[in-house]
Amino acid sequence: VSKIYPSAAQPARLYESVCDDILKRIDRGEWSERGKLPSIRELAQELGVHRLTVFKAYQLLKQSGKAYVKDKSGYYLKTGSLSPDLTATPAVHSHIQQNPLSDIQRVPVVYQFSQALLDPNLLPNQYLSAYVKQAFDLYPKVLGTYAPVQGDPELREAMAEYLAAEHRLALTSGELLITSGAQQALDLLAKTLLKPRDAVLVDRPTYGAAMDIFRSYGAQLAAVDIHPHGYDLEQVARLMKERKPRFFYLNPTFHNPTGYTVSAEQRKRLVELAAEHRCLLVEDDAFHDIYFKQPPPPPLFAYDTEGYVAYIRSFSKYIAPGLRIAAVAARSPVIGNLLTAKSLADNGTPLLTQKIFLLLFFSDRMQRHLEKLRIALHVRMNIMEEALSGIGLSWTKPAGGLNLWVKLPDGVKAGALLAKGIEQSLTFVPGTICDPLAEFDDRIRLSYSYANENQLREGVRLLAGLLRSLA
């Protein structure tokens, strides 16, 4: 039990109470301006709380402008942080602003295993600028023009042709919406489909930010277990029948965080179950092009003839994150409702980024780059797997994507391991963040795509030492 919080308190709010206690102590002058705050370990021991709780409290201080981080040194108070106006401003505690994954990813560390993003050196930086110039040459008025809310017609037409050729998707450009990234697409879908207390099926484990979005609209999440072989379809059918969900959010291709891929046979059956129970399937497909040997099966949308699949295809992670481009394929009336929500959200994704993406993605040069990128990521995955072997961990080898879903040795908890890792400039994603039941404290997600090859080897050696210290 924390020394500063009653035992009846909600555990999820404990870090906020710690933050409030720190603010009071700052106000009392216990720490001087620009002075160093106690280390995460020291304050956790003093207060009788977990180190991860103190880490989250320090992150709140940082976000509110009262503290800053020095790399490999710790947290320091900012000048002026003791002013009455600042200390009187309470931390904002709304659910929407709680994002544990974002908190972890913002920590400046040397060994960054929490980011399912590409090492910037793997992106097509050398010739991206050429396509930016080409966009201005071909569309000189691009900055003086709003894009249509649904997206640039030229891009939507090219995307419809691409999806038809690559994945056998039968759709028109009118059934596509261009969004500013996949996360906006998820938010628009939740906004148009959900009302408080609606049930939503989600994979267990799943993408943590998606759960945050759905919960922010009042959804009640029901977990569907995903395994290396896919889903227990009897469980899916039972939950669809009993919970009558508004939709089932799933990630069947190089699943985040597990890396699993659902077979074509199961995809067909999932679409049949969706039609049988009148449940929309929301398919999130961020890694379709990141395969190491054979391409994955076609998206669920390819098997849908009755409008029970909304397909989100994103490209930002491996093309150019700054472009923030995704496409949503859906039938009527879903696409019409999304269009209305998009018009209220931002009235259209910027035309310039759409034109740059159009020129870049469909070029022969980009397709050659993707072939090299798959090889580079496969090499990095192998490096991480080799480094992880022999230290008591287990995982299922993925056939693509950016992550390993790793089971820790018996008795080792992900939260404790992360707290130690942060102290040693290493981060990863604890399994609890990916679990709708907030369990999986014996699992971690390690991303092999952001760190370079030397950092992968050195970081895993450091991780092995941390594991030994907790064994």
Predicted features along the sequence, with ranges:
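Short beta-strand "wing" residues that participate in macromolecule-binding interfaces
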Residues: 68-70, 171, 428
